[in-house]
Amino acid sequence: MASLILGAPPRVTVALPSSRLSSSHSETAGVSLSCFTHQFSLSTSSSSSIPLVYCGRGDRKTAKGKRFNHSFGNARPRNKSKGRGPERVPVPPAPPRKDKFENDEKIKIDIDESLFSN
């Protein structure tokens, strides 16, 4: 019954009569199962744009989805404007800082050529 609610085809097993008494011999009925899969494929193609159940990492309203999106907060807040505080005044951009390693100083490097000759 739960498989019908979720949209999965139910599993039908038929025990075949055998001369040996064995409980491990059971086969699925191919005719009825193919009928269920045919109906299932038709129903999924018409409603493929809407997922049946949308939960997990991508759901921003669950705790796992909040952690995945790096968003910390209530999963389903009641009042969205509550607790935000007054609006902040936009701050003008700061002037660019001078890099302490960048300067216009040039250093003369003397290379001893005798080290390279063999």
UniProtKB/Swiss-Prot annotation:
Q: Where is the transit peptide?
A: 1-55
Transmembrane ranges?
none
Task: Name the domain of life this protein comes from.
Answer: Eukaryota
Q: How does it assemble?
A: Part of the 30S ribosomal subunit.
Q: Where in the cell is it found?
A: Plastid, Chloroplast
Q: Give the chief site where it resides.
A: plastid
Q: Which organism is it from?
A: Arabidopsis thaliana
Q: Name one GO cellular component term.
A: chloroplast
In the record, Phosphoserine modifications are located at S117
Q: Where is this region: Disordered?
A: 61-118
Give me the stretches of Basic and acidic residues compositional bias.
Answer: 96-111
Keyword presence, Ribonucleoprotein? yes
Task: Give the gene name.
Answer: RPS31
Its keywords, alphabetically, are: Chloroplast, Phosphoprotein, Plastid, Ribonucleoprotein, Ribosomal protein, Transit peptide
This one is known as Small ribosomal subunit protein bTHXc
Q: Which family does it belong to?
A: Belongs to the bacterial ribosomal protein bTHX family.
**InterPro entries named among the record's database cross-references:** Ribosomal_bTHX/bTHXc/bTHXm, Ribosomal_bTHXc/bTHXc_plant
Could you mention a single GO BP entry for this protein? plastid translation
Enumerate the GO terms in the molecular function aspect. mRNA binding
- What NCBIfam families does UniProt report for this protein, alphabetically? ribo_THX (TIGR04560)
Key word Transit peptide present in the record? Answer: yes
